[in-house]
């Protein structure tokens, strides 16, 4: 097959930025006060995307029947041993996360050096597995810097696994306020219609249907209040019984799906306002 000659060379097309990265950039332009937080988030998200391209799609050696049975027993679907972590990649990602947080002054020099030492520790796999199991219990973290770094390090591994599992089994009958995938607490919620709320795990980004009138922390159904912000795009459900709150995005009013990194940064001022009233994130 022949093609007609071209008079001039065509300029190469610019590759479009991924939606999440473009939305973060637009957020910083619209709200310059959020630019430092956006810059940090863009570095984290870019590193995650690069790692996930190298890792490919994970495979969990468990049948759909076994997954359904676990849900019925109230057990989380992803145990640490099933993830098959690539430890050289994990250690590299941990170093990258620590370096990013240090550049943005989230960590001081001493803390960064300590966390780099942990990343080189031969006992790192046991440390991470213990963190994974303790995070499912929802208790206070003894070492918040390590907890934050491990959460960011494991996220590209865990979110991809959660995506795969969520395609294989429905979690809509899961009755708990903790994630059916990894057992952690919700970090956000999605409102698709009035009274219909899906919680979104703060650790693996797994989703599950949960009663919009019930607090996922204490399961109280008569002490919740809901506030709207940003013209109703965001909502905050606060519980007067346990003093916890969960943020949500109304996807119809937003005109787009939840973008976890974008919406987390976009609602930082909302977090501060709710915390000033004595509430803590779930």
PLM region descriptions:
Residues 1-2:
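Long C-terminal interaction/binding lobes of large macromolecular proteins
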Residues 11-166:
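N-terminal alpha-helical interaction blocks
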Residues 278-281:
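Extended, helix-rich structural scaffolds rather than catalytic motifs
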Residues 156, 160-274:
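Cys/His-clustered metal-coordination modules, chiefly Zn-binding fingers
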